[in-house]
Each structure stands twice: as structure tokens, then as C-alpha cells.
Amino acid sequence: LHAEQNGAEFTLVVAAFLHDIGHFIAEQQQLTGVDEYGHHQHAEIAANWLAEQGFPASVYQPIRYHVLAKRYLMTELSSDELSTASNFTLMQQGGLLSSKEQRSFEHNNYFHQAITLRKYDDLGKPLTSTFLNKKPLTTPWLILIEQVLAENTT
């Protein structure tokens, strides 16, 4: 919703909607590591699955790196600027980045999209949100998703 309201690129709007799908895939596949906040490797699970489904890299790569973006942004933010879930999972996901890791990430082709996606992600989370109480919307998002997939196959 925030991505769309801010006039983000079409594919980033879809990425913002689908970025946490890895939690649901992990739960559905009964993968080890699912807790009340979802799965700590949800970004990788989602990106791989979306690539397999034919989504363009402009959708799945920002998703792949949005956790790394959180770790990057935490070096400049205080912990009270993140949701409870984001603070809890930060340590599961590797904690803060070193200076070397920060510089490396800044050279990633999807750095800016991942940072933007991460910011939309935190804007969309109430400070007490948990994975288990989220109910995703299904329309009109399905129309957007179909359009992105159709454009990627032409």
C-alpha cells in the first residue's frame, strides 16, 4: 500500500506486496525454523520461489535483499524505529552489518530497491505485529501480479 501511494515502480509495488510470501511458503512446506514471526530465511525462500514462477528480477531481487537492507539500515537507526518483529528477528538474520559488509551491499545492483522495499515493509508493520496475525489482501493485487508476469514473458 505504501509503495503504491508513493508512486513506486510497478514491480516494486508487487515486490512490496509479495515480500513476505516466504513465511507462508515455509509454513505450508512445514520447514524447520518457523516461529511466531515467520521464518528467518523468508527472503531467500520468497525470491527463489518467485524466480521459479517467472517473476522478473526487479520483483524478486529486492525481496531477496530486503533483510540485508534491514541489517544495513539498523546501523543508522535506533532499535525503537523498527517493529517488535523486526527487532526480534534482526539477531536471527545476522545482526548489524560490518563496515565492509555495508560497502559491499552499497554496490549491489538492487541496493536502492531493497532499501526502499525495507522502508515500505516497516511502514506497513504495527509496532506489535507478528506473522501469525497477518491476513494478506488478495485483490486488486492479483491483477497487478498478472500484469507483471505477463510483461516478463513478452
Model-based region annotation:
Residues 123-154:
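Charged phosphate-binding loop/patch that engages nucleotide di/tri-phosphates or the phosphate backbone
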Residues 6-120:
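Divalent metal-dependent catalytic cores for phosphoryl transfer on phosphate-bearing substrates
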